[in-house]
Amino acid sequence: MGKQAEFWSESKNNSKIDGQPKAKSRFASKRPNGTINTHPQERMRAANQQEE
């Protein structure tokens, strides 16, 4: 295995997923009225409802 592959393998195996997420609400995409999409599952369910 080459040095670059060894480095990648080590960094992959040593990665930590503990702690706070890096995503911040101030960077979230917002609609023109300032709201954000906080309940996407509800929206998707409503879009898939069959109208009779």
Swiss-Prot record:
Domain of life: Bacteria
Compartments (UniProt record): Spore core
Entry keyword NADP: no
Keywords: Sporulation
Start and end residues of each stretch annotated as Disordered: 1-52
Keyword match Transport: no
Induction details: Expressed only in the forespore compartment of sporulating cells.
InterPro entries attached to this UniProt entry: SASP_SspK
GO terms (BP aspect): asexual sporulation; sporulation resulting in formation of a cellular spore
GO cellular component entries: endospore-forming forespore
NCBIfam families per record: PRK03081.1 (NF002843), SASP_sspK (TIGR03091)
Family the entry assigns: Belongs to the SspK family.
Protein name (Swiss-Prot/TrEMBL): Small, acid-soluble spore protein K
Organism taxonomic ancestry: Bacteria, Bacillati, Bacillota, Bacilli, Bacillales
